Amino acid sequence: MLLLPHQYPFITMRTLVIGDIHGAPRALIQVLQRADIQHDDFLIFLGDYADGWSETPELLDFLIGYRQKHRCLFLRGNHDALCYDFLLGKPMDTLWRLHGGKATEKAYLNVTHERRNAHLNFLAELENHYLDSKNRLFLHAGFTNLRGIAHEHFEQMFYWDRTLWEVAQSCNLSPTDPHFPNRLKLYTEIYIGHTPTTRLGSDKPLSFNGVTNVDTGAAFKGRITIMDIDTRDYWQSDPVYTLYPDEQGRNI
C-alpha cells in the first residue's frame, strides 16, 4: 500500500518529481543515482515511460521492481495510454509509430506473455492526477475545465492537453487582474511533463505562472530530470541520446 506524505507527519523527506522517460532506463538509473534517492523520499513520476528509445520493456520491469523498495506514485502519460492499447492488441496507426511507437513495437517482439501481462497491469494502474495536502497538483499534461480536475469531462485531457502549458507561458497578467486565467488560480503549484522544454530552447525545467514543466526532452536531444519541489533543486541525466548512440529516439 502506498503511504502518502501527509501520512508521515514526523518524517523529513523529499518530494521529487520525475519528468518524461520514453523507454530510456539507462538515463533514469543515472539520474536516480545523481539525486541520491533515500528510502523516505516520495517519488512522483509524471508519465510517458513508453515510446522513443528501445528499452520500454526493460524500463517497465525496472519501475515495477523499484516501487517495491521506494515510495512511488506513477501518473499516466499519453504514450503510456498508447502503449497499453498496443499491448492489448488494438490496431495502432502510423502516427503512433512515427512518434516513438516503432521502437516499442520492435522491443516487444521477443517479450514473454507473462512480462507483457505484468506491463499491462502496471499501465492499467497508473493514476491520472495527484493533488497533495498543500494543494499542489501533479499530472502529465493538463486539464481544460475552468473549475479544475474534479470537473474535467474528458479524462484523456489529463494526459493529452497542451493548452494549460500554453496559457501559463503566454499570460503576462497579474494574478489579481480579473482577466487572469481561472485555471492558474486553482492550485498552489502545478507540475507537468508532456511538452518538452527543448521546444523553448532549454533542456532545464521551466516555470510560468505556477506551472512547472519537468519534461526536458528525453525523447529527443534532452535529458531526464528529477526535481525536489520544496527546494527547487534538480538533477539531470546526460543527454539521453548519448546513452543510446546507435538509436534515433524520436529524432526523426
Please state what every model-predicted region is:
Residues 2-11, 33-36, 65-67, 130-132, ...:
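A short acidic-Thr-Gly-centered motif at the start of a beta-strand
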Residues 20, 43, 48, 77-78, ...:
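Divalent metal-coordination and catalytic microenvironments
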